[in-house]
């Protein structure tokens, strides 16, 4: 998997994707608007408290990696940002509106069931029924240029399996971790996965910092 986003990078991109669809009149977003979106209490898991400085650092890094681009001029006093993560003119990653809604909601809230995704992604795409949600997830999991999502083992006592995005790690690692924790009944699988994602993100940031230092 060529995408390796940290947890905060996933939040930033998810916010830009969300606002592009739900509030197009306010898009692209300034660093202040991105910060407010990242720290938003609704439709976010976990709720963050990022500083504008932190968000600016992540925006700069994502611009360098060509996931975002800056927009200035034409009466804009401040630099604004728009996503180039998917469906951009020169990018290879193309998603349908249903796929954008699912991917965005997973980036913003982590692993969720198809039922939760249908409800939470409804502002971005009106799914006709659960079959459309499940078909969209299947498409994202089986695409030749993916996979972009995976189904987690069902938690004990739960009726539905959850799905998670794969933009922050490779399939094999996540599958092995999911299989390792699936028999454990006394701990929440969600907490274990969230902790893993945070650890991977922190390790990647430390590696990026080390590589940058070595390159000086």
From Swiss-Prot:
InterPro entries: DUF480 (IPR007432), WH-like_DNA-bd_sf (IPR036388), WH_DNA-bd_sf (IPR036390). It holds the Pfam family DUF480. HAMAP family: UPF0502. Belongs to the UPF0502 family. NCBIfam families: PRK11239.1 (NF008413). PANTHER family: UPF0502 PROTEIN YCEH. This is UPF0502 protein Ent638_1581. It comes from Enterobacter sp. (strain 638).
